[in-house]
Amino acid sequence: HSFPTRRSSDLELTQIQMAAEWDRIELELQDESLWYFFNQTPNTEGTYIDAIFKIMHPNNTFAEFYKELRGKDANTKNMWRKVYNLFLQLKEWHDDEKIGGLAWFTIKNIRNLKNENYKNIDFREEIKDWLKKERLACESNGKIEIKLDEVGYGDDYIREIIELANVCYCVDKRILFPYEKTRNLDIEHISAQDDDLEKFNNAFFESLDAPLAFVNKVLEDHNLTNNDIKTNVETLKQRIEEERQNKHKFWELYDDIKKFPILSQFVGSLDEKEKNNIGNLVLLPKSINRSYKNAIFTKKRNVIAKACGEIMPLTLRAFFREYYDVQEAEKNIEFALYWTEEDVKCLKNYEKRLIEKILN
């Protein structure tokens, strides 16, 4: 009889262990949350582990890397340990509510993980250095100050700043950042961007069915009454019904509505600078963005509410104004109906404070 040598037995055990670990990586990376933690697009390679190989050797193909791993020397074992350790580190970051989102932002926007010193990355410092480099922040007495006053639609890094605000919201609330919701997102204006009344016409008539039912629900939930708002909305709705068949009178109705301080908000009252301010911008899935087009705020909010499972956390809070003090919100219940200059300012300042709180 021939017996396996100690060396061949060790090799077989190593290969069995590698196979089990390989299978674990393949299985766990099929979880969308973990996959999108360090990938921006769906897997098209067939094998999920290829994404780990590409981090370590961006220019190597899967076949080349796999061939090296099939070797039968100590280097093979060492190489595999690096692969598996990187996977374990990615998973550890992903599962950590305190730093996971910061790690995701850093990997996506600032640096790669090819350097084996990735375990020593200080994500807060990486992000602070990036913000200062791009002139989005300054540092004084060891504290970072975020500059959002001049950041708006079309500017460099506007998407990244909104992403970072969402990340910091999740870190602050100790909730897992929704990595799988970060794909196919558009930057969307909360208050309608398009003021072309021809385009706005149909959306306007369709949208204004919503306010009365919404007001009634808000008043009921808060046990409040505000007859002025209710009467104005009821009157508006009645006029809409009368004019619906005579759309050539739309312009007259539109002009009349703009004369009322409350009702004018239904059709938007932000000037061009406010519309493009970061406080009027959110990230929304492209499908939802297209579905409500130029609808007014109350209609948009209804769409958002129905699709809340697909929405980034801070976007939801923006549409439902959870950054307002509760007593202040109840005192200004009409704010529930539209998005104002004050909202733009509040959301921008809220995002600024969030980022500073988490990074300092």
Across the structure, where does each feature detected by a protein language model lie?
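Flexible coil/loop and intrinsically disordered segments
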Residues: 1-2, 6-360
